[in-house]
């Protein structure tokens, strides 16, 4: 059986929601490309790994393909709600990140968590989100804010507010 790969190229209307149950958080990533709407769920461990991998990728990109990040284009995903009804396509086992220099796009690859129910081997489905650097950074920041917990956040840009406020790129 051939592996099913779903490409959202380019992925639009990204949304990341978090549902906390006791000490574990379940994340919901939703996006669309054209008429295809995809919803994935993943656990806190995958979220932490994704945020860390994002920063590692950005360290590499800064060295090999430097380009300033446009803070105004980073989506503030905290204010977005999922399209209802929510019907997750799959639960993510792991994420991978890639970069395509020709289009200056990052690729967020989600591999399905398979539970063995049959004797026939099945390849896990993959979903590839072709997104900008700013979109990927928005996902990582949303994950980090969800894991840190509530704190003062700038309503305009989503950055943490220090004791003396901060320089907001969106409102200045």
Named regions from a protein language model:
Residues 165-172:
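Short cysteine/histidine-rich zinc-coordinating motifs and their immediately flanking basic loops
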Residues 32, 43, 100, 111, ...:
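Structured beta-strand/turn binding interfaces of compact recognition modules in eukaryotic regulators
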Residues 40-42, 113-165:
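Mixed-charge, glycine-accented linear interaction segment located at domain edges/termini
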Residues 58-69:
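Conserved helix-adjacent loop modules within structured domains
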Residues 25-31, 50, 54, 106-110, ...:
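Short, structured motif recognition centered on aromatic/hydrophobic residues
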Residues 1-60:
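The feature marks the first
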Residues 1-24, 69-126:
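Intrinsic, low-complexity N-terminal interaction/targeting segments
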């Amino acid at each position: 059986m051939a592996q099913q790969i779903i490409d959202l190229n380019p992925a639009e209307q990204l949304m990341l929601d978090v549902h906390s149950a006791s000490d574990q958080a379940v994340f919901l990533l939703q996006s669309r490309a054209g008429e295809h709407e995809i919803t994935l769920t993943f656990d806190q461990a995958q979220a932490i790994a994704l945020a860390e991998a994002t920063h590692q990728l950005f360290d590499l990109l800064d060295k090999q393909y430097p380009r300033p990040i446009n803070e105004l284009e980073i989506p503030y995903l905290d204010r977005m709600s999922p399209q209802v009804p929510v019907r997750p396509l799959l639960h993510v086992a792991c994420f991978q990140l890639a970069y395509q220099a020709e289009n200056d796009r990052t690729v967020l690859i989600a591999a399905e968590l398979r539970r063995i129910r049959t004797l026939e081997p099945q390849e896990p489905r993959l979903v590839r989100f072709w997104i900008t650097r700013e979109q990927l950074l928005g996902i990582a920041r949303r994950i980090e804010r969800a894991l840190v917990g509530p704190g003062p956040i700038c309503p305009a840009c989503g950055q943490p507010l220090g004791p003396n406020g901060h320089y907001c790129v969106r409102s200045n």
